[in-house]
Amino acid sequence: MEAPNYTITLDGATRPATDIVMNANMFNTTPDEGFEYVMVEISVTCKIDECAFTPYNFNVIGSESVVYDPEIMVAGVDGMLESGKMLQGGTRSGKVFFIVREGETDLVLRWDPLLGDEIFFDIPET
């Protein structure tokens, strides 16, 4: 999908991803009863001279209309999508994790920048 400064691609998703997170580091946040981790894999390419990017502009929304923010502290998982700067044509790819209610359906990944329009991606069922 095209945003003013970026091309954003949803490369894949894994649900549940709780075992991935908990096996990576015993100190990662354990989801509350009735919740689970979802992992999305995203690629972001800069379309202008220079971009500052953060994965914290992504969130997940499902059938219950609840907005789930990304988990900030997930340790021990290789390939996390990290904040940083890119020059035109540069790409950052990686994983972002969310804790969502089990049974929540129709998950959508939302790119919600401070300035500009939101972009939505259907998260495939896995």
Residues covered by each model-derived region:
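Conserved functional micro-motifs across diverse proteins
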Residues: 1-39, 43-126
